[in-house]
Amino acid sequence: MTITKYINTLEYTYDKNHAISHYRINEGGYRNKGELLESIAKYHRGIYAEVNPNIAWNAGSDIESESASVKSSGASLGRGIGGYAATADEKIEAYFKNVSSTTFIWIHMNEDTQEVIEYHMNRAEFEIFVSKFTRVCNSSNHKELAIRFRKHTKKMEAWFESMATT
């Protein structure tokens, strides 16, 4: 595992009155926080791509050049795959069976300082991360299970630090 820190330079605005997605980049479409963080990670790498909110999940990587999937607080793990799996384990198994990414990036940003921290994990590390820091809930349509990542916490940071030193 590696940890990368940088200061965000991508300009965005925050609109607390917008229904769901509160962030806008260059007066483009609204993004939720996860989409904003993915955009920041791409921008840091010199990539600018418009987010398509109509794509729930695809087998490709968020950052193709690194074969990397980007995740952050509150994200769903593979929403729309695994169908109506009876258990969370089946849903997680379907995700790992279908995802093509070999690197997984957990991204967190302090909005006051704009400091961004990326935690880069391989597949085995990410599987452990998923087992420790996700919760099971009903999806928004209440027809299937949703695997959601918990909020970024000090406990999570301690886990990342311990993994980075091993």
Region spans (language model):
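Nucleic-acid endonuclease domains
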Residues: M1-T166
